[in-house]
Amino acid sequence: MKYIVVTGGVMSGLGKGITIASIGRNLKNKGYKVTAIKIDPYINIDAGTMSPYQHGEVFVLRDGGEVDLDLGNYERFLDTELTRDHNLTTGKIYQEVIAKERRGDYLGKTVQIIPHITNEIKSRIRKVAARSGADVCLVEIGGTVGDIESMPFLEAVRQMHREEPSENIVFIHVTLVMEDLQGEQKTKPSQHSVKELRALGLSPEVIVTRSKTPLQESAKEKIALFCDVPQELVISAHDAADIYEVPLEIEEQGLTTRLMKHLKLESSVEDNGWREMVSRMKSTTEEVKLAIVGKYTNLEDSYLSILEAVKHGGIDNGCKVEVNMVEAETLEEDPAEIEKLRQFDGILIPGGFGGRGTEGKMLAIKFARENDVPFLGICLGMQLAVIEFARNVVNLENANSTEFDEDTPYPVIDILPEQTGVADMGGTMRLGDYDAILKDGSLATKLYGTNYIVERHRHRYEVNPEFVDRLESFGIVFSGKNKNRMEIAEIPDKRFFFASQFHPEFRSRPGRPSPPFKGLVRAMCKYNKEKEGQ
C-alpha cells in the first residue's frame, strides 16, 4: 500500500480536501485505484449532530455514515463510494480504546496516548486502506499543525513514516501564502508552519501553497530554500475559476509524475475524461437561474453537495446555472418577496430540520406549483411539498408535520414508526442506502431510465401512509416507494415538479449527474427559452 499524507498549516479551511481529491483524481487518471481517509480531530463521534453553521453540510455515505463534507469531495473527484470508517475522529479512537481497556484487552497496562491511542490510529488507517483494495491511500489530517487536538494523529503518521519503506509513504504540507498591499507574496507564515511540523518529527517532501494568484518565482525559491524541499516540489494551488480545474493545474506542474516517481509507481495509462469534462463546463454559453430557498443560506457549504449536483446537471445540459440563495424567513416576513421568484427558471427546496422557515418554503413551493416553475424538493423539501398540496389543493386546513405541530388535525407527515421513543440524536435516523420501486410511465422512471433505484437517506419523518390515497385522488403521484414508504412525489401535469425523500445530491458526480438534477436543469433550460419567446 502506498500512502500520501496531507497536513495543513497557518490556518484551517485552506482547501486540503480539494488538494487531496485533486491528487487522487490525477492518480486515478493514470490507472490507479485510489481511496481517501479524512481525520477530524474533534471529540464528536461523527458529524451527524453538528450545526451546518459550524461545519457545513453533513455528507451521508452509502452505509449511513454521517461525515465531514470533504468526503463528499473525495467521492465526487474519485468517483468512488466510501464508508463511515473512512472518517476517523478523536471520538471514535478514544471510544474504541476505552472499550478495549474495559474488556481487559491491554492486560492491566496503563493506557496512554503513546502507544495505545497512536497504535489505534495506525491500525484504523491500515485496515481501511487494506479493505479498500486500493493502490494508493490518501490521508488528510484535519485542522492546523500546532493545534493540540491534532497531536496524537501527527505522532501516529510520524511513526508510520518510520515503519513504512520510504517508497511507500510521502508527506505533503498545504500552507497559505498571503499578499501584502503591494501584491508581494509573503512566505514567512509558511516557513514557520513547516518549522513547527519539523519540531514534531515530520518533514514534508512536497509543499502545496494556497494563494489568490499563481505563486511567484521569488516566493517559490524562498519556500524551497527555507523549507528544504526541491523547487519543483513547491506547487502552486492558486484560486481557480472552479474547483474541477484544480487537478489540471496541479498536473501541469508535474506533481503527479513526481509523486509516482517517489512511490515507485509506473503507468502508461492516460484518461482524459476529466479534462474533457472541464472543457465542456467552460464552454457553456446558455445560462439559467435557480433559487435555493433554505434556512442555512448564510453559509453555502451548508448545501455544498446540492450546489455541486446542480453544476453537474448544468454541465450535462450544456448550460451554466446561476444559483441564488433565498432566505426562507424573508418570504414569511414580506409576502411581496414572493414576486421576486418570477426571475428564476427553477426553485429548489433542500433538506433541513426544525420549523424555522418552513412556512416561507411552502410559499415558494406554492408559487412554483401555481406558476408551473420547474421545482425540485429534497427530503424536508418533499415533506413540505406534500403539506402545501394537502392544504391548498386537497383543502386539509392546518395540515402539517408532527415535527412542527403534534396536534395537527391532518398529520400528512409523521414520524417513522421505528423512531418513536428514540432518545439519542446521533446516528439514529433512517440513514444511508435504501431502494425504491418506481411507477411505470412516471417522470421518475423517465429520469432514471429504470424502475429500480438505490439512493441515500437522512430523515426521521415520512409521508403518512394513511393520507396517500386521498392525496393521490387530487393529482399528486407517489411514483417511488420502498414497501409502504413514499420515496418520490410528482405532479404529472406540471413542467417539472419532482420531490424525493432521499438525497440524490450525494450520488451525483461530474460527468454522471444525478437524474433529478439533470432533469431539473433540462426543464429550466426549456422554461427559460419559452419565457424568452413570449
Swiss-Prot record:
Binding residues annotated for L-glutamine, in chain numbering: 53, 352, 380-383, 403, 460
Binding site for Mg(2+): 70, 140
Span of the signal peptide: none
Keyword annotations of the record: ATP-binding, Glutamine amidotransferase, Ligase, Magnesium, Metal-binding, Nucleotide-binding, Pyrimidine biosynthesis
Catalytic residue positions: 379, 503, 505
Pathway listed: Pyrimidine metabolism; CTP biosynthesis via de novo pathway; CTP from UDP: step 2/2
First-tier enzyme category under EC: ligase
EC number: 6.3.4.2
Residues the record lists as binding UTP: 12, 186-191, 222
Single GO BP term: 'de novo' CTP biosynthetic process
SUPFAM superfamilies, alphabetized: Class I glutamine amidotransferase-like, P-loop containing nucleoside triphosphate hydrolases
Domain Glutamine amidotransferase type-1: 289-530
Residues the entry annotates as binding CTP: 12, 147-149, 186-191, 222
Regulation: Allosterically activated by GTP, when glutamine is the substrate; GTP has no effect on the reaction when ammonia is the substrate. The allosteric effector GTP functions by stabilizing the protein conformation that binds the tetrahedral intermediate(s) formed during glutamine hydrolysis. Inhibited by the product CTP, via allosteric rather than competitive inhibition.
Pfam family, one: GATase
InterPro entries per UniProt: Class_I_gatase-like, CTP_synthase, CTP_synthase_N, GATASE, GATase1_CTP_Synthase, P-loop_NTPase
Record-listed ATP binding positions: 13-18, 70
Keyword Metal-binding part of the UniProt annotation: yes
Catalytic activity: UTP + L-glutamine + ATP + H2O = CTP + L-glutamate + ADP + phosphate + 2 H(+); L-glutamine + H2O = L-glutamate + NH4(+); UTP + NH4(+) + ATP = CTP + ADP + phosphate + 2 H(+)
Family note: Belongs to the CTP synthase family.
Further comment: CTPSs have evolved a hybrid strategy for distinguishing between UTP and CTP. The overlapping regions of the product feedback inhibitory and substrate sites recognize a common feature in both compounds, the triphosphate moiety. To differentiate isosteric substrate and product pyrimidine rings, an additional pocket far from the expected kinase/ligase catalytic site, specifically recognizes the cytosine and ribose portions of the product inhibitor.
Function statement: Catalyzes the ATP-dependent amination of UTP to CTP with either L-glutamine or ammonia as the source of nitrogen. Regulates intracellular CTP levels through interactions with the four ribonucleotide triphosphates.
PANTHER family found in the cross-reference section: CTP SYNTHASE (PTHR11550), CTP SYNTHASE-RELATED (PTHR11550:SF0)
Descriptive protein name: CTP synthase
Organism of provenance: Methanosarcina acetivorans (strain ATCC 35395 / DSM 2834 / JCM 12185 / C2A)
Name of the gene: pyrG
